[in-house]
Design a protein with these regions (language model features):
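Internal metal/ion-chelating core segments
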Residues: 1-35
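Beta-rich accessory regions
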Residues: 20, 28-259
Length: 259
């Protein structure tokens, strides 16, 4: 659901509008949709799909493999920040990468929650060999990357494109963008007790950041000035993997064309 009017808190509901879900239990979970008349829900149990700047009005469906897939709108209506760089090219928003939704117990809280992970088909977009990330500064030629970091310390900084920073310290994670890179986007932050893995899908103007295999996700548009993908790491014993990605190809059989 995508409610409007939730009061912003220190680490929740920081966007103009929110998107998220409630986990229903007992008799409500067992009823069919047309049997449910009125349910009173506590907003304290409302779980946001995404903690970043640009995520709204997601849709889900069941695919041929029986997976529940979510695709979100990477944009935020009535936000203070803009997409002036793409507006100059005649377009503004885009869609997120399809995410598989998995309901399971959070090992840190012991509570059930929905995890999100990029669908496995992303592996078909990987080109060339896997590139180990062992240096604190790495420049990739490719605009689109699939980055994975493991063995993370209790505090760390990951910076992309000279302007997007992911900072984790004292169980607080923050995503911040400079004015030049963020086009008005500033900072989004929240609490997470442990971060063991960080996966980042890098496209030319959108980042999707998955923490702990999808326990928490941040999505943001960004606008870099230099080609390729610049990566800076601020912690010791860097361990990561990088996969260059090619574009998604869509076969339009109705018009006999590929886009």
């Amino acid at each position: 659901m995508s409610p409007q009017g939730l009061t912003a808190q220190t680490d929740r509901f920081q966007n103009q509008y929110q998107s998220g879900y409630f986990l229903l239990e007992g008799r409500h979970a067992e009823k069919k949709e047309d049997e449910i008349q009125t349910i009173y829900l506590d907003t304290g149990r409302f779980a946001e799909w995404d903690k970043g700047f640009d995520f709204y009005a997601p849709q889900t469906f069941i695919d041929q493999k029986g997976r529940r897939i979510l695709i979100g709108w990477a944009g935020m209506p009535d936000a203070e920040y803009t997409n002036k760089e793409t507006l100059q090219e005649g377009w503004q928003h885009c869609l997120t990468f399809p995410r598989e939704l998995i309901l399971k117990e959070n090992p840190y809280s012991g509570e059930p929650q929905i995890y999100q992970k990029p669908i496995d088909e992303i592996m078909k977009l990987r080109t060339g060999k896997c590139i180990p990330i062992t240096q604190k500064t790495t420049q990739f030629e490719n605009e689109c990357m699939d980055l994975l970091f493991i063995g993370l310390p209790e505090s760390f900084v990951i910076e992309i494109a000279d302007g997007v920073r992911i900072v984790y310290q004292d169980q607080k994670v923050a995503l911040s963008l400079t004015e030049e890179c963020g086009s008005g986007r500033t900072i989004r932050k929240t609490t997470i007790p442990v971060i063991e893995t960080v996966r980042i899908l890098v496209d030319s103007s959108i980042l999707e950041i998955y923490l702990n295999d999808g326990e928490m996700v941040f999505t943001t548009r960004y606008y870099k000035k230099a080609p390729g993908t610049l990566l800076r790491i601020d912690y010791e014993n860097v361990r990561g993997l990088a996969y260059p990605l090619q574009a998604i190809t869509v076969n339009d059989k109705t018009r006999n064309r590929t886009v």
